[in-house]
């Protein structure tokens, strides 16, 4: 679907990281398979585990991004909900700490870039377009993730610890543009969630929001918290990063 606003002035691109540049779904699948084998009864269906984890039906991670929960608290709640659904034991603080150490080690093993990430960065470099990352996780954590995934060239600009909140708060988008030396109206945002990425970027005053809607990867089968039947002005849907440059007219 074409963008209904002029993108000819786009000179900077802000990126989400998880499930946009980095295959975080794959990393979660690996980590959940590891802890599932150790802590859940019976055969482990890694695809079911990762679908449940990413759906996060009670919205604990988004509560963290709004500054309402700590990082540890949101993950512990999600881990215990996963155990309740799949027959695992209720974890107290000590049990959760052991679980999380195993989970985090396996999660980090799985950090790899999507295959279309580097070619897009190459295209942006060739076009002279500045870029950087704005994420709903902590800056240092995401810097490590980008580096481990082979995306060292992507500046980590804004995280949830910058203002104490994350997307869709408009400040995070505006600060990302400012750090790239770009006016909001000359910046685009690229992310995998329709509501807190693409639409929120447009609402913050960016030129456009690009929703990367990879086939078979929506959280709980839905469009990242929004109705995808009408994307709204300034929002474009693509199925892969390889289509982003063309969508922005670069």
Spans of model-derived segments:
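Asp-based, Mg2+/Mn2+-dependent phosphohydrolase catalytic module
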Residues: 1-13, 118, 122-125, 129-250
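N-terminal helical cap/lid subdomain that shapes the substrate entry/recognition surface
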Residues: 7-115
């Amino acid at each position: 679907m074409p963008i209904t606003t002029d993108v000819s002035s786009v000179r900077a691109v802000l990126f989400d990281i998880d499930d946009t540049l980095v295959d975080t779904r794959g990393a979660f699948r690996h980590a959940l398979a590891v802890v599932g084998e150790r802590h859940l009864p019976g055969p482990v269906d890694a695809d079911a585990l990762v679908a449940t984890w990413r759906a996060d039906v009670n919205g604990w991670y988004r509560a963290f991004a709004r500054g309402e929960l700590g990082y540890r608290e949101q993950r512990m709640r999600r881990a215990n909900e996963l155990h309740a659904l799949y027959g695992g034991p209720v974890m107290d603080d000590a049990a959760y700490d052991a679980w999380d150490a195993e989970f985090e080690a396996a999660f980090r093993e799985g950090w790899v870039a999507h295959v279309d990430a580097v070619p897009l960065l190459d295209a942006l470099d060739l076009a002279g377009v500045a870029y950087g990352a704005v994420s709903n996780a902590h800056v240092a954590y995401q810097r490590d993730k980008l580096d481990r995934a082979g995306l060292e060239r992507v500046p980590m600009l804004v995280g949830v610890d910058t203002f104490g909140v994350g997307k869709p708060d408009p400040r995070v988008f505006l600060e990302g543009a400012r750090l790239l030396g770009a006016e909001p109206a000359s910046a685009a945002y690229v992310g995998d969630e329709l509501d807190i990425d693409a639409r929120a970027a447009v609402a913050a005053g960016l030129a456009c929001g690009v929703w990367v809607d990879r086939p078979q990867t929506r959280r709980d089968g839905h469009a990242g918290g929004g109705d995808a039947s009408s994307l709204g002005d300034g929002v474009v849907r693509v199925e892969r990063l390889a289509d982003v440059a063309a969508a922005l007219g670069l």
